[in-house]
Amino acid sequence: MKYKTIQTLMLPDSEEENYGLYYQGTEGVRLIGGEEKSLYIPENGNVDLFTYFNGFYPKQWAQYAELNGLHVKVTVSGSCSVSLCHTDGKRTVVNGEEECLAGDEERTVTFEVPDPQHSKAFWICVKGLKQGGYLRNITVQTEVERLQEVNLAAVICTCRREKEVIGNLERISRMDIKERPEIFLIDNGNTLTEYMVP
C-alpha cells in the first residue's frame, strides 16, 4: 500500500519564536537549530505537541484528504518514551506508548491511529529517560487510494514575518500574469499597512 505524508513536524527558527505554537515543554527542553531542527528532552523532562502547528485535527483534514489507514511515524534518538495521545473533547487518552533506547542511532516508531473521525485531535508526547532524548521528526501519513484534483495553497503566519511576506509578494507580482498564483492575504494581527502590499 502506498502512503502519502499529509503533515510533518514544524519547529520555529529559535526558541523565542515558539510562543507555545509549536511545542510545550518542561524546564530543560531545548530547540536544537541547524538544517535539521530537533527538540532535546532532558531526563524526566516532557514535551507535548498538542499545539497549533503540530496537533493533528482529523475533522479539518478529512475535508482535504482520505484518512484511511492513518498512522503517525515518530523519529527519535537517545533515550525517551513516545506516546500518541488523543482527545474526544472531554478527556485525554493515551493510544500507545513506546520506550526507545536508541542511543546515537535514530529510531522510528509507528503508531496506527484508531478511528480518527471520532477524535477532535491527535498529538505526540515525548518524555526524556536516562540521559535524555531527541525528537527528530514526526510525519502523519494516510493510504493513497484515489487521485483527487488539488488546488495548492501556501499559508504563512504574518506575525514577525512582515519583511519576508512583502518580499515574496513583490516577487510574485513580477511574474507573468498567466503563471501568477492567486493570493489571499489575511493579516489578523493588523501588522501590514495597505501601502506595504504590492
Model-inferred region functions:
Residues 183-185:
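Hydrophobic/aromatic residues located in beta-strands of well-ordered beta-sheets
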Residues 167-168, 195-197:
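Short alpha-helix adjacent to the SAM-binding motif of class I
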Residues 187-196:
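A conserved acidic beta->alpha catalytic loop
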Residues 162, 180-181:
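Secondary-structure boundary/capping signal
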Residues 169-180, 191:
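Short, acidic, metal-binding catalytic loop of nucleotide-sugar glycosyltransferases
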Residues 3, 9-11, 15-67, 71, ...:
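N-proximal low-complexity "stem/linker" segments adjacent to membrane-targeting elements
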